[in-house]
Amino acid sequence: MTLWMASPPEVHSALLSSGPGPGSVLSAAGVWSSLSAEYAAVADELIGLLGAVQTGAWQGPSAAAYVAAHAPYLAWLMRASETSAEAAARHETVAAAYTTAVAAMPTLVELAANHTLHGVLVATNFFGINTIPIALNEADYARMWTQAASTMATYQAVAEAAVASAPQTTPAPPILAAEAADDDHDHDHDHGGEPTPLDYLVAEILRIISGGRLIWDPAEGTMNGIPFEDYTDAAQPIWWVVRAIEFSKDFETFVQELFVNPVEAFQFYFELLLFDYPTHIVQIVEALSQSPQLLAVALGSVISNLGAVTGFAGLSGLAGMQPAAIPALAPVAAAPPTLPAVAMAPTMAAPGAAVASAAAPASAPAASTVASATPAPPPAPGAAGFGYPYAIAPPGIGFGSGMSASASAQRKAPQPDSAAAAAAAAAVRDQARARRRRRVTRRGYGDEFMDMNIDVDPDWGPPPGEDPVTSTVASDRGAGHLGFAGTARREAVADAAGMTTLAGDDFGDGPTTPMVPGSWDPDRDAPGSAEPGDRG
């Protein structure tokens, strides 16, 4: 409660005088009174209607069920009328408390007059002649202070009591018979247990995301004030939201019961399977039947899933089958490659035809070997030009060029008709490739070299007693003109002169002794220094 004594009376008087007044409270009380009268009028009308039903032509159990279905709603109307009337009375009480507080509160004029009188008395208090009037004035101001504080405290207590005692109107019950409610949902289990903080968090998130259009009450199990079971149209998006919340709460309840009482947990889940899930499946089927497009999409997804399942089943059946044995090819002796011998013919006309005609006799054995498999392809006509004779077979396909045989032939060679011919051709190609990849190795018996550090008289030495011929002249035999065939020789290029004897220079008599190994004896090897007996 507010400590009203701490404030001067001017504050309380100003608050009451400057407020909106009792007009708004009395207006609210009038609205509540009219609402109470409306509820009472509807209740009276319903009572008359139910009485007419019971006394009219409608007789039997259905009429009684109709009256019984409206009984809760009729009771709610009468209770709502009483609640509204009581709320109106509470508003009138608050308005009366405000009016009383304003009447009991010292006015600002009275307070101002007290302050003015106090100032005059103090100003004219010569020799203390106004002491008693000043004391009386101050006592009157203290009375107004206490009166203002007590008035505000009383007004606060009456207003708070009226607001706290105002009854709350409950939601209207549905007008349904007990049998109809059971037919709508044939189970009496509870979707979820006690609400958890996570449930309230999810409810707040739904409210924020939907902009206040989805209000989930975890304690009551309602969505927008309507129970979950009243949402039966699966074509509406809110139905799926409600079902998602319902299934999550069902799973939460099952897990909680599983740790407390497993028997009740499985009994709860069994009730869901028997009563809850079939009801929702029927609702989905009804929604799909009303929308052919959704039905086509649902059937398409089901058919595609069935096709995938049957496909995997077929693959599993194939996994159990034994693969058929593949017959092995009979080994065929590879025909030895024959090299066509080409005659040296300097002819210039039709070199391709000449080579083909010369190679025909030599390739006859190979053709006879595989004659049973396939006939030999006709020779490809060659282009006009110089024909270079070869002593070996010309380069085949894959030798050095990436071109295929069809690039120079007018038509393709016929394919072999049997596996034996293909095997023979593959063997020939493998042997040819092996020969091309073979490398020449040096013989092992050519690794010794001759030692020249021995005394041996050369065979080209002069006879005993004669001087050696020291002059070396250029040979008059040449190697001829070198270069590529078909090129012209330039006459300005001088021919090689060979080895010549250098003439003596101005500083010596002639060429000096060349640099020789230290193991050679120059005196012994000089001309004329050796004795005839030593040469023997």
Swiss-Prot record:
Biased composition range(s): Basic and acidic residues: 521-536
Any Gene Ontology biological process? response to host immune response
Q: Which InterPro entries match?
A: PPE-PPW_C, PPE_dom, PPE_sf
Give the top-rank taxon of the lineage listed in the UniProt record for this protein.
Bacteria
**Disordered: annotated segments:** 501-536
Write out the similarity annotation: Belongs to the mycobacterial PPE family.
Please report the name of this protein according to its UniProt entry. Answer: Uncharacterized PPE family protein PPE3
| Species annotation | Mycobacterium tuberculosis (strain CDC 1551 / Oshkosh)
Gene assigned in the entry: PPE3
